Amino acid sequence: MSYDKLNSFRIDGENEYDELCLKYGKARVDREIELELESKENAFNAFMSKRSKAIESGTLGNMGASRVLISEAIPVMTKALDKWFKEVDTGKPGKRHVMASLIRSLTSEEIAFIAIRTIIENSLGIVSLTKVSSAIGEAIEDELRFKMVVATMDKKELSRFNAGLDKRISMQFKKRYVENKEKILADEKRLKRWNKWGNANRVQIGLKLVDIFIVSTGLGALEKTVGDNKNVHYTFCLDTDVLTYLEHEDTETASLMFQNRPMVIPPKPWSNPFDGGYLINLKKPIQLVRMPSNECAQLYDEVDMPNVYKAVNAIQSTAWRINRRVLDVANEVCSWAHIPEALEMPSATPAEPPMRPAEADTNEEVQRDWRSAMVHYYQDDNKRKSKRYLVNGVLALANTYKDDMEIYFPHNLDFRGRVYPLTQLSPQGNDFTKALIEFAEGVPLGENGHTWLAFQGANCYGLDKKPFEERIAWVYSNTEMILSIARDPLQDLRWTETDSPWEFLAFCFEWADYLDKGNSYVSHLPIAFDGSCSGLQHFSAMLRDEVGGEAVNLMPDDHVHDIYGIVASKVTELLKKDYDNGTDDIMAKTEDGDDYLKKGTRSMATEWLKHGVTRKVTKRSTMTLCYGSSKFGFAEQVLEDTIYPALSKNPTAFSRPSQSARYMAGLIWEALQGVVVKAVEAMGWLQVASGLLAQDKDINGQSLPTYWVTPAGFPVKQNYNKVVLKQLRTFTTGTIRVKEPFKEDSQIEEGASINPVVYERTPEIDTRKQKQGIAPNYVHSMDASHLMLTVCSCVDKGIRSFAMIHDSYGAPAGHGDIMFTTVREVFVDTYSKNDVLQDLHDHIENLLSPKMVDKLPKIPSKGNLDLELVKESMYAFS
């Protein structure tokens, strides 16, 4: 290794390099340095390649530097347009009145946005003035035509139309979709077909907008040339400073890029908020906490948080390796033309598109149905491509590192203290990704490790709601199947029918080895102990809620309590009541005065009872309750998870999908109030307390954020500030965030230069966001604290390998007994030794002004849950 290369790394000279080489071997250290240099170079080249493609396709306006420039230029040109419109209104009638009348139904901001973006995307060299003017005129006309079409629609029709528009990727298909809708509306006599401007009008309007752009912003110029035949030609070009700025800023952005990949030596231990992880020096260094660097320094630089550093460093210093046997199967399956859907590995070959019926030539309805089918086909194929791209990326990484004896995943934290890997291939991936890796440092199974190995296999198969003994017995009674899969997984595909097929396959290989070698077998497979609806577990513990605690398995029992099933049963009881005594269907009116059938609770209950309410119907809503989900959110989840899939199989399953979703959401909400009373009370208290802080002011007149320190010692600051920005949306040029319009008394000189800036948040806190975010952020910080303290305790007990995912605690099977006990002990200690809600109450009480402090309610009363019972609960974390 050339010592010159070390200048790019956080390696303190030759001595530290030599120490690393002595510790890990020169070949590994040099490989890590080369991999990091390659990651930086690859990321730079990928960004610049993307920029080149954007220039070629005329979409540079989507790139970062261009968007900043456009955002800054919009208010300048907007003011100039307002001035021009006033001059038109007070001047003599003429050509400019005609131009103004054509475009006046757009706001000045919309016109400015369309014109500026079109100019930038069409003027990266010297271009014909006529060409760029025509492009602007065409974009303006398309926008006006779009607005004409949507103006005829009510809210319901507009919602469906926008959904259809979003499904079309390219502008070509979007425009065709609008034109088709226009034709339908015209046939229904709801509007007149658009009277096309013609190129002359487009060019005239474009010319005027180019002129206003040049005069107001000073970002472009015209050049006059006279040809041999004395014809005068005008060309337009952006100012060279603008072109230089765009290229420089995009190049700078590219230089900040880095491909986060696994390391082949342990990551640099975190010792402060800015020093840890990769060895390379980056212009934009990776921080311990994912937030703006100034805030990170302010909040964490001087904070003593030994448990935080100890936990993160233990997790990221876990040695992993590629599971070669799973990788070999994955490489083979990836080449199959038809891959089982459960494997989360889309085929490389697209499905056959719908055939166009011969009748489509003469039958407009058949043609429309075929086009609709093609839209769905392209949608599904785009999803396939996207998923395939991710799979290929993970596989490529696995194949790159398959020969390395050890690999490592650098980690850092979000602002709540949750631990995240920086890499795509990681222990926190999906089933497929997790199965591709295993602990490099194996642990002998010993006397009881085989039980935890069987426990893992049963869970991956889908038996995680069965009693513990039944899970273990199932593995032994199905040994023949497991061994058959391990011998030839490409022939015996029964593993593909399980809940977590890839992880089950990894288990099959491991179980076969155990049966061959016995308790002395050195196992490398991570065994996961998962929380049971973790957020509700934490709220139930902090408020000693025995009802909620029992529902989420904090109390010992001989069977697993399935809160999703409990809620489903209560919902079914409510449905039966509505079936017997519910309301009837009636005709009602929309806000727009249109008649519609409002389904009664009796008929909706009938449909739901016929469909059946299982734990799958209630799972996501129950799980997300303590993460801030509301009845409206529940309805969206029910539509997505249950109703739409049901309708795809039986179009008559739900006659009014949205009404049925809202109805079910209300029932789930009602059922939850009786199951997790204290959790609901805790969330309500948190929202009130956070809202009071946001509405109050400190001595400097600024709003107060919500701040707390977790039991692990990690400071959390929830601070959602208001931003003086607004989003401008157009059909032709998409969306952009711009500063609020200039006030009437603002002074903008024509030709004033524009200096793009990074927008800063205002000191004012957004009360609504503070209240919405506090419950999920608070409970996430608590599960993060539990994870950190569990890791610290396990390190003290000798565990060196961790597979941690927020509320899932993974360790080698040979250390299963230790992890099983520790995760419960730490949970109990956390809430026995810390009254976290009361501490937060007292902290907020000290911050609030006298007029606000009287509005702060006491924390919800506590129940009678004996936390010590959690240590005896088999299913609290299983």
Q: What spans do the regions from the language model cover?
A:
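C-terminal substrate/ligand-recognition segments
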Residues: 780-784, 788-794
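Non-catalytic nucleic-acid-binding interfaces of large nucleic-acid enzymes and RNP effectors
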Residues: 1-619, 628-777, 793, 797, ...
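Conserved short loop/turn motifs at secondary-structure junctions
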Residues: 622-624, 640, 806-812
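Short, contiguous acidic/charged loop-to-helix segments that flank catalytic cores in large enzymes
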Residues: 773-782, 810-811
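Short, conserved catalytic/metal-binding motifs centered on acidic residues
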Residues: 417, 787, 807
